[in-house]
UniProtKB/Swiss-Prot annotation:
UniProt entry keywords in alphabetical sequence: Calcium, Disulfide bond, Glycoprotein, Hydrolase, Metal-binding, Protease, Repeat, Secreted, Serine protease, Signal, Zymogen
UniProt keyword Signal present: yes
Signal peptide: 1-21
Domain spans labelled CUB: 312-425, 435-547
Entry protein name: Ovochymase-2
Region (Disordered): 835-863
Carbohydrate-modified residues: N39, N766, N858, N932
Cystine pairs: C75-C91, C174-C244, C205-C223, C234-C263, C312-C342, C369-C388, C435-C462, C489-C510, C618-C634, C716-C779, C744-C757, C769-C798
Propeptide, chain numbering: 22-49, 593-980
SMART domains: CUB, Tryp_SPc
Similarity remark: Belongs to the peptidase S1 family.
Function: Mediates gamete interaction by affecting the vitelline coat.
Amino acid sequence: MAETSVFSIMMLTVMTAVGRGATDRPGRVSRCGERPSANASVTYNLLSRIVGGTSAVKGESPWMVSLKRDGKHFCGGTIISDKHVLTAAHCVLDKNIEYHVRVSIGDHDFTVYERSEQIFAIKAVFKHPNFNPIRPFNYDLAIVELGESIAFDKDIQPACLPSPDDVFPTGTLCIALGWGRLQENGRLPSSLQQVVLPLIEYRKCLSIMETVDRRLAFETVVCAGFPEGGKDACQGDSGGPFLCQRSQGRWVLVGVTSWGLGCARKWVDNILDPPERRGSPGVFTDIQRLLNWLSANLNQDKPDFPTYEVQCSTNDGIEKGTAGEILLPTDYRKYYSNNEKCIWTIIVPKGKHILLTFNSFNVEWDYSCDLDYLVIYSALGRLIGKFCGDVRPRPLLIADASVTLKFISDFQEYKTGFSLFYQAVEPNTYPDSDCGSVAVIFEEGEIQTMNHPHVYSSHANCQWVVHSPANHIIKITFLVFEVEPSEGCIFDRLVVYHDLQGTMVAGIFCGFSLPDPVLSVSNVMQITFTSDYSVNYLGFQAVISFVLPSSPVKSETQWKGNNQPRKNQDAMQHYEEGCGVSPLPPRFIHHNIIKAEEAMPNSWPWHVSINFGNKHLCNGAILSKTFVVTSANCVADREEFPSVGLIVAGLHDLESSTDAQKRTVEYVIVHPDYNRLSKDYDVALIHVQMPFQYNSHVQPICLPDGHSKLEPSKLCVVSGWDLNVELSTKLQQLEVPVLMDDVCKKYYDGITDRMFCAGVIAEEDNVSCLAQSGAPLVCQSDPGTYVIFGIVSWGVGCNEPPKAGVYSSVPLFIPWIMETILSVAGIANTDTEPHHPLIPPDKLSQEKALLPDSPPSNDSSSSQDIYVTCKDVMSLQSPGEIKLVASAQDGPEGGRCQLIFQAPEDHFILLHFKQLSHEHYSLIIYEGASSNKTFKAQLTEEKIPTIMKSVGPVITIEASSTAQDSALHLWLSYSFHNQN
């Protein structure tokens, strides 16, 4: 009877959790794929552009290796264990390589000594036996065994090898590293370089390579790169790592740099170019395809290591019946093999459910279970649990008649494995949930979302019921918490109840802030987790503990909670003071340039929906409290009936606009040169009747200066509700590379100087459907700050083979945009009528009150227009216009002067720059004056803002030169405005 009681409790004690040991042991001295010395806020810049390479940040690549011959770098490599480095086979063809080559790790800049740098001798080299140096296109991989072991620390760590079931989809942005040449036949850099490249579909790569040489056959390669070139690995990068990031953050060695035709050459339309000018994507040796060879050679020095010729050391496959046992390995005295991949599918009679009970469990531990692990999938392929460590997982009740188990082991560290018993049970024996299992917990331990530490599943509906011993209450303490944020937690949520009926709510949680511990009011607690159909994060991990009611409790508020999204307070102290900064920073899970993903709610706070007839028509971006920019083709036919238009800001879900700001359109201003047929000058401004109220969901986007130009392959972001062919009700985001003009013109007729293309030319989803018109394309300027560079104009239809999107180039329209807004506000020409007859004259006074977002008018009736030379200090206390000139004639050592603009105490200053040209002059702008001034900006001819706003009432422009051939011409207007 006692035995039956114990088994009954075991059946009820069901939870989906990562098994772990009783102590928080590291499992290994190192943690592969992590960067301990890198700043937590710093990551590989996936929105950077590199031609041949740009300097990596020291500490970001602790697995990087330099192979040096006679002290000079010639190839790269990657640390994968304390004694092994991976490189390309073609890098280690020297017969006496052990004598001539040394391995340098912890090095970043070759020109300086770094404390982290260590030099190792080579003990042995193992080239893949199928590598052919005459045709070095396949199996280009070698293991370098070091003479001594590496001592891992914060500066030196191994990269992760891929597991057999790692999948990185086409378009995923990955990183290549090396000290290779910055351009074809160019110079070698002194510091480590990095380049961001998207993965190319395998068959697409093969078709490209046929244009290079039809005789080439590729079996073990992975390709990456941009069709228009501009980014690539280059000479000297050979053997270096090509890494992709798992969803939970670890970096995986997907490839080893092998070869490419030229460096960063374009390969789009290769067949049209002469052979000597053709290019190719970057070609990397595919590590995943060579895992078996790696495992066999990395474990040669382990005498007790079991070797198997088959992929799985036991009999896997289909298990049918009402009960049975699965063992790995089959002999309890042995270990499981490294590099194993075993798959079992359990099928019980139709109408039954499956109970899994673990008898033993000992699998290499890792906090994210990425090394060795057992995963369990439902019949529909939904992940139920992922397990590692030496603690037996609790019994799992699978709400189906079929379940799949997969065991994966990596190339090092092996344990005694596991054994489990499966049994068919009646469906109604225990309550099920859509998680595929139910958790009824009687013991202290951990719970977590399915698939943690990977993203949780869509449509989850999970439930845990916790019972504590008599005279105890339950405490849940959160270790990890990342759940899709939303106001009121309406999308994904974790709810804690004080009762089994679900009537006493202890707390509702979502977002990224770690909730406070939650205490029950009795010895029962119910926890539910639900998710909608999209936007999945890492979920939560929490500790369940039992405490006495007399234990100290902060207050009753500790029992309740509502975990709302974090604000980006550091980036934006006040909503009114900035542009292009999201209080809820954007976040990408997949970093894919082909398939869009749902944006984190309100992370693009300038994006608006333009509605006509109560339906979403197209997109736009907020420029000020009263102006929105969009495409002319969106609104050109609606100029005469603007009042039927509605601008919806702060919107994430088109079907749920409860918290959004809705503004009626006052008038529409289409660029006067807009051509309906050619879509040239495809830009328009929309003025709303009532100003937007800036908050965490509604913010303006920054405008670029008129001289800005995007370089090819620059990665930017386009947002919209329709990026993946079908119209999505929730806002999506997609990273897109900017294409070269000639590539764009090859695919589209009618590309003008006011257009550019961005996106991927591939047989995937089109990014420029009709309903996406007007959507903003934004690029990072400073970290966390975005600038609008493009407005979606047109593209091919959604049902055709896609091409890149065509965008109106915003920098070229800056003069028109600013002139229009200024004329409405009455600044640019206060004594003249507005430039656009659609703007009623009686609206000008209303506009003046809306600054600084719409550039304001002067508060003072007096003004001064001054023409001065650069000498001494000049104080300007009335608004007006000034032209500052200087030349070598001003003095034998050039000129030096200060312009101090002094507004009333409660005002700010608006500078409107009209012209700047200088030779050997330094122009610096400061907030404040004299000893109280602080640096604000440095002006150059290439980087001059159209308008600059001060924070306080005083701003200083300092011009200086010591050169005899110096010259300066600065022309600007300035105005003072009330802070209120």
